[in-house]
C-alpha cells in the first residue's frame, strides 16, 4: 500500500472535527488509472468540505489480498470504508460517480452528527477498518512465508534424494573394485594379475575421489547458502533464459566470425534456482568460450535432461583447451594458465560460478583435451 495522503480539506484549511471520510482507491498499472488518480486528487484539493477526506491509493499488484478482502471484481475501484456502511464504486465513469456520491456521504455525516452518534460510531468504524487492513496485510505476509518454506522443504527433500542417487554409483563401483581386489590377492603373482590389481587400485581410488568431491560440494553448498549468497529460488525454464542470453551475443559471434550451435530441447522440465545467478554463470562461461576460441571457431550451448532429478547445461568451445592437471584448479580464485598470457584469466569468474552452482546443490566441471577445446558443464535440480 502506498503511504496514505494527508487528509484533504477544503483549500487546505484545518478542521476541528475528528470526523472524516475514509477512502481506498484501487488502481492497476494502466495509464488510465493514473489519470483517474490525478482527477480525484485534483477534485478533492479544490473541494469545500466541512469534513476531512482521507484518500489512500492501493496498487492491486502489490496488495492482491486487499482486492480479495473487499471482493472487488474490476479496477479502478473506490471503496468508502468509513463512516459505515461500506460503499464500493467502479466503472469507466468512476470520477463522476465519486462526485455524485461524495455529496450524499457528506450529508449522511451531518445527519449522524445531529443524532449525536456519529463521532463514536465513526471512530469505531475507522479503527475496525484499519485493523482489518493490518490483519489482511499480516495474513498475506504469513501465507507468502509459508509457501516459501514449503518450497524450501520440498527442495531439500529432492536434493537429499538426488545426492543419495549420485553417491550410490561411485560407492557401488568402489565396493566392486575392492571386493575384486581381495579375490585378486589370492591369485598367483603373474604379470597379468599384477596389472589387474593396479587397475583395480586406480578404479577404487577414482571412485573414492568422486565421492569425496560430492561430499565437499555438499559442505561448500551449505556454507555458500549461509554466508555468501542470498538465493531467490523459483521455478523457471532454461529454454527461455538461454534464448534471452544468446540474443545478447549475436553481434559478438558475428564480429569474431564464430560458428554458434545450440541444442536446447523444448520439452525440458523447469528448474528450481535463482534465475539471475544462473544467468551470470551462463554468461560467464559463454564469454570465456568466446575469449579463448580463435576466429572461425565454434561455440556450442546444449541443455540435457540427464535424469528425473537434474538438468545439465554444457558450453563447449574449440579453443586451446586446458591441461588435465589444471582442470580442477581453474575453479579456484586467481589461477592463471599459460594461455592466459595477455588475457584476463578465468580465475575469479569460474570461482564465482562454482560457488553459485554449489549453492544450488549442483555440480560444475570441465572436460578438455589440449588443442581440442573445452566443455564446461553444470547441473541444476529439476522443479517437481
Swiss-Prot record:
Gene3D superfamilies: 1.10.287.130, Glutaredoxin, Histidine kinase-like ATPase, C-terminal domain
All residue ranges annotated as the Histidine kinase domain in the record: 162-384
Catalytic activity: ATP + protein L-histidine = ADP + protein N-phospho-L-histidine
InterPro entries linked: HATPase_C_sf, His_kinase_dom, HisK_dim/P_dom, HisK_dim/P_sf, KaiB_domain, Kinase_SasA, Sensor_HK_Regulatory, Sig_transdc_His_kin-like_C
Residue numbers of Phosphohistidine PTMs: 165
A GO MF label: phosphorelay sensor kinase activity
EC number: 2.7.13.3
Catalytic EC class: transferase
CDD domains given in the database record: HATPase, HisKA, KaiB_like
Family matches, as SUPFAM superfamilies: ATPase domain of HSP90 chaperone/DNA topoisomerase II/histidine kinase (SSF55874), Homodimeric domain of signal transducing histidine kinase (SSF47384), Thioredoxin-like (SSF52833)
Gene Ontology biological-process entries: circadian rhythm
Alphabetical UniProt keywords: ATP-binding, Biological rhythms, Kinase, Nucleotide-binding, Phosphoprotein, Transferase, Two-component regulatory system
Role this protein plays: Member of the two-component regulatory system SasA/RpaA involved in genome-wide circadian gene expression. One of several clock output pathways. Participates in the Kai clock protein complex, the main circadian regulator in cyanobacteria, via its interaction with KaiC. KaiC enhances the autophosphorylation activity of SasA, which then transfers its phosphate group to RpaA to activate it. In addition to its output function, recruits fold-shifted KaiB (KaiB(fs)) to KaiC to cooperatively form the KaiB(6):KaiC(6) complex (independent of SasA kinase activity).
Subunit (UniProt): Homooligomerizes. Interacts with KaiC. Participates in the KaiABC clock complex, whose core is composed of a KaiC homohexamer, 6 KaiB and up to 6 KaiA dimers. SasA and KaiB(fs) compete to bind to KaiC.
Domain comment, as recorded: The N-terminus interacts with KaiC, while the C-terminal histidine kinase domain autophosphorylates and is probably responsible for self-oligomerization. The N-terminal domain stimulates the C-terminus to autophosphorylate.
The protein, known as: Adaptive-response sensory kinase SasA
Source species of the chain: Microcystis aeruginosa (strain NIES-843 / IAM M-2473)
Amino acid at each position: 500500500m502506498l503511504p496514505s495522503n494527508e487528509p484533504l480539506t477544503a483549500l487546505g484549511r484545518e478542521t476541528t472535527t475528528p470526523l472524516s471520510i475514509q477512502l481506498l482507491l484501487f488502481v492497476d498499472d494502466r495509464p488510465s488509472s493514473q489519470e483517474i488518480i490525478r482527477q480525484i486528487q485534483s477534485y478533492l484539493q479544490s473541494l469545500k468540505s466541512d469534513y476531512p477526506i482521507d484518500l489512500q491509493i492501493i496498487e492491486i499488484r502489490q496488495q492482491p489480498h486487499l482486492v480479495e478482502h473487499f471482493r472487488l471484481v474490476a479496477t479502478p475501484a473506490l471503496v468508502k470504508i468509513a463512516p459505515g456502511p461500506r460503499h464500493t464504486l467502479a466503472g469507466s465513469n468512476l470520477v463522476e460517480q465519486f462526485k455524485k456520491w461524495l455529496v450524499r456521504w457528506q450529508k449522511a455525516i451531518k445527519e449522524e452528527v445531529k443524532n449525536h452518534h456519529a463521532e463514536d460510531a465513526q471512530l469505531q468504524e475507522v479503527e475496525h477498518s484499519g485493523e482489518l487492513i493490518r490483519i489482511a496485510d499480516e495474513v498475506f505476509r504469513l501465507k507468502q512465508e509459508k509457501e516459501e518454506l514449503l518450497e524450501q522443504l520440498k527442495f531439500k527433500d529432492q536434493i537429499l534424494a538426488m545426492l543419495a542417487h549420485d553417491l550410490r554409483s561411485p560407492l557401488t563401483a568402489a565396493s566392486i573394485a575392492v571386493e575384486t581386489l581381495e579375490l585378486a590377492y589370492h591369485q598367483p603373482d603373474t604379470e597379468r594379475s599384477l596389472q589387474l590389481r593396479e587397475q583395480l587400485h586406480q578404479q577404487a581410488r577414482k571412485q573414492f575421489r568422486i565421492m569425496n568431491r560430492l561430499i565437499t560440494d555438499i559442505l561448500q553448498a551449505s556454507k555458500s547458502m549461509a554466508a555468501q549468497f542470498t538465493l531467490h529460488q523459483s521455478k523457471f525454464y532454461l529454454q527461455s533464459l538461454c534464448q534471452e542470453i544468446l540474443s545478447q551475443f549475436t553481434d559478438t559471434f558475428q564480429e569474431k566470425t564464430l560458428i554458434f550451435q545450440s541444442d536446447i530441447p523444448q520439452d525440458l522440465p523447469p528448474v528450481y534456482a535463482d534465475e539471475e545467478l544462473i544467468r551470470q554463470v551462463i554468461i560467464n562461461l559463454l564469454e570465456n568460450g568466446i575469449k579463448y576460441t580463435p576466429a572461425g571457431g565454434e561455440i556450442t550451448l546444449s541443455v540435457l535432461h540427464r535424469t528425473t532429478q537434474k538438468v545439465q547445461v554444457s558450453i563447449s568451445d574449440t579453443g586451446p583447451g586446458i591441461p588435465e592437471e589444471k582442470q580442477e584448479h581453474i575453479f579456484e580464485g586467481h589461477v592463471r594458465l599459460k594461455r592466459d598470457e595477455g588475457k584476463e584469466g578465468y580465475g575469479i569468474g569460474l570461482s564465482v560460478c562454482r560457488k553459485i552452482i554449489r549453492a544450488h546443490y549442483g555440480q560444475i566441471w570441465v572436460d578438455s583435451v589440449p588443442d581440442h577445446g573445452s566443455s564446461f558443464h553444470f547441473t541444476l535440480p529439476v522443479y517437481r
